[in-house]
């Protein structure tokens, strides 16, 4: 039962939860023994569920990278090209993954923003000093930029700055790109809101022109290693693109 209203066999109980996100709801559960147990729960919105699923996906990917690399590599996902995502990546690569030999940068399903310059600066560090304390190495310099090996994963769902950021990563020869091609969608837009504030859209006003005179818009970015996640393996929890990125980066490290 939900809030005292019994749920009969075949009954659609979703209307009983409609509009109840964030509220205390009494749920009565009848066990096989016939005993009824009351539980007070707080339903969450679909948006919260999606956020929880996303965090679980990131944790799963990070665990797979640690397992398949033997702890040699770290994993970060750029959820968006924005400040919160950058802070998470910055904290992880210079914190929890500071001991790792390299990092897997996942940009799949990123809807864009503006972060290509920040990612370029962060991942293009070159070691020039080692800080030493009483005969023990403390840290490398620069200590606020990543100066180890990295690799980037892309996918067809990358959009806007999630096309421009991998392009800069490729152009600056920062590392290999693994995954699927990214549509040429690198532009900047002005956001316009209509009289109904739920309706808004971006109007492209800025193009990004390369030295040869062509634009990033409509210029599809091809990965160095083209890997498709087949549906037969996705449903089993496998991520072939992630596995390929791990293998390629480990091979790069082993050749040093």
Model-derived features with residue positions:
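Cleft-lining beta-strand/loop regions that shape enzyme active-site pockets
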Residues: 4-196, 233-241, 247-255
